[in-house]
Amino acid sequence: MKITCTDKLKKDIVSIAYSLFLRYNSNRNFMKGLAMYQFDPHIHTISSGHGTNCTITDIAKQAASIGLLMVGITDHGPATPGAGRASYFRNLAYAPKTRCGIEILYGAEANILDSNGTLDLEDEILEVLDYVIISMHQPTYKPGTTEENTFAYINAMKHPKVKIIGHCDDVKFPVDYEALVIAAKHYDVLLEINNASLSPDGYRGDVSGNVKSILEACKKHNHPVVLSSDSHGLANIGNFQYAFEAIKTNHFPESLVLNSSKELFNTFLQNK
């Protein structure tokens, strides 16, 4: 019998192999680029409208299988084509906080819509979420100048539920990282080191220089970062390989990487 290796089968094989690899390495120090951190704060489900058909329960099962303790469900805001409507995010307030033994945080990756930092979710909905990631995407945000983009991020991060700036390494949206980190420290917001951006098949351009600038500014101002997979689906949940390599290459203190403790991150969420 001939077996055809479809794209889905290939993804399933990669997912299984990755799970086994992490399980094998779960008791080793993360010196080879796949850090066994405790949580992944940036994961997407079918409600993001693209890239996956997995559910929150699917994600919890996968997270449990690779030894994570906590995940953040952060689907794209409603301005993203095909993403969940406002009612989806509103109802997350009633979702179970634990699945398959994994602590679940419910958030959103809200779209910044303009240079004033307007988000695509109303305050009443943001208030019921555990935290919010703010990001720039096309076509929901038109790339501006360095000053305009930085101004937009700073305005958006003023909302008390905003705790992470997502993939601000994107070369399409130039940013003044020094000014951004100073503001982020003031407003208790983390800059994300996004593994998907740094991966060889990333689509945000050559972000290595921008990531270096982010880490240098955060180190200078003693401000922590958070690593994320930005996984759309199961295959890359908890995969921080390239983000971890950036941390090591740029000699960034591991003490400033919040993924090492879910308690530290949960405490950080209470600030502001």
Predicted regions and their residues:
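Histidine-centered catalytic micro-motifs
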Residues: 38-49, 165-169, 229
